[in-house]
Amino acid sequence: MVSTRAYAARYRFAIRNMLAERLRQLPYLVHTNRELGLMLRGMKPLAYFMNVVGREPDICIGYWRMFDRHVAVGRLIRREMIEAHPDQPPLACRKLFYALPGHEWRIDAMLMLLNEPGAWSDDRERRFGELLGYEQRQNDHWLTHRTG
């Protein structure tokens, strides 16, 4: 079994290599791969992960276990949903949410947002960011400078 310290070191190394250059150059701290630390400091109210069941990278499973340690002692709330993959019905998707206590409402709001019919829009992107804990100025910048 890998120690928590060794795993954290491997995880930090993976973070540096996984973040896209575009995200690293944003003028604010991007939450991606920093969710747990931000949540434990009270700076992020909600984390959301989605993967195909059975195809989760080991690094993700290990990261979720780190969250689950805090769920076990009441620092975080966890909700998991498994649904048919929208584009490949034989596959299943896991939607995994972690929220700070008192912010469980964000999970329900995020599920409503993700299940809204119609094309993804700037308004939906903004609400997505707000639910995850990004500030208005950060969402403004993202919407102005994102591509694709």
At which residue positions do the language-model features occur?
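An amphipathic, hydrophobic-aromatic interaction surface with interspersed Lys/Arg
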Residues: D122-G129
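Activity-critical C-terminal alpha-helical subdomain
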Residues: L132-G133
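Short, 15-30-residue, compositionally biased linear elements
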Residues: G118-W120
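A conserved ligand/cofactor-binding region detector
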Residues: V2-E116, R127, Q136-D140, T144-R146
